[in-house]
């Protein structure tokens, strides 16, 4: 089963290991971790991640996010830090302000990134492929949108079923609840009247990721064809697959 790392000063830290593929294989633990921002990590939490095997951190946040909340591994002498501004510095809120169904809104945003930020998606995947000997952690702010998009590509490379990938995506609803109530919830929204299932429905429904995969399959034939089309080499694809499946 996938592993959640319960750190007191970081949200949504999860291992991509433990998922069955369509051929009956299981993705390996301690290869790729996905998470939210790491700027509040204590020395103890940093040590826990290093003990888990983390040797590379890939930060997918926007420039202003990195400047406002620098990653604690930015100046580490033991962990390599890579910043890739995956989505550019446009306002994410513009997508949400359009209103409408959450799955439509969120999937439209992800598809926009996948179609309009191809060089940066490629850069992220190539960086992940280059750091496969140990554990690599990739993160954004909440570990849901940018990270969820990249995680879906990694799992697709390993032939994990689309339904499972969508389920992995929705788990952010479970592990972002504390942040939601700490930082985002209106005063009248409480744990008593708003559960993680409600959050999941409002912010990360499975249907959103299913729509993304439907788009890529319709436009490119397969997810792997999309990955190849943006210039990710066969060697990099093989490295990712080997890391997660052995």
PLM features per residue range, with description:
Residues 1-137, 150-246:
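Cys-dependent protein tyrosine phosphatase-like superfamily
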Residues 142, 146-147:
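Ser/Thr-glycine-rich phosphate-binding loops at phosphate-binding pockets of nucleotides
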């Amino acid at each position: 089963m996938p592993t959640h790392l319960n750190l007191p000063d970081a949200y949504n830290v999860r291992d991509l290991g433990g998922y069955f593929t369509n051929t009956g294989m299981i993705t390996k633990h301690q290869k790729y971790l996905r998470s939210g921002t790491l700027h509040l990590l204590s020395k103890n939490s940093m040590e826990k991640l290093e003990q888990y095997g983390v040797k590379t951190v890939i930060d997918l946040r926007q420039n202003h996010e990195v400047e406002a909340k620098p990653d604690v591994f930015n100046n580490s002498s033991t962990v390599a830090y890579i910043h890739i501004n995956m989505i550019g510095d446009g306002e994410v809120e513009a997508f949400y302000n359009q209103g409408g169904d959450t799955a439509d809104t969120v999937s439209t945003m992800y598809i926009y990134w996948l179609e309009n930020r191809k060089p940066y998606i490629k850069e992220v995947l190539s960086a992940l492929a280059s750091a496969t000997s140990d554990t690599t952690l990739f993160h954004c702010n909440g570990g849901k949108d940018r990270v969820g998009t990249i995680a879906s590509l990694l799992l697709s490379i390993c032939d994990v079923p689309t339904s499972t990938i969508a389920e992995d995506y929705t788990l952010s609803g479970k592990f972002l609840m504390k942040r939601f109530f700490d930082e985002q919830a209106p005063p009248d929204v409480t744990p008593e009247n708003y559960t993680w299932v409600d959050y999941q429905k409002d912010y990360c429904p499975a249907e959103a990721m299913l729509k993304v995969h439907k788009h890529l399959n319709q436009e490119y034939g397969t997810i792997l064809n999309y990955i190849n089309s943006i210039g990710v080499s066969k060697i990099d694809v093989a490295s990712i697959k080997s890391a997660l499946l052995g």
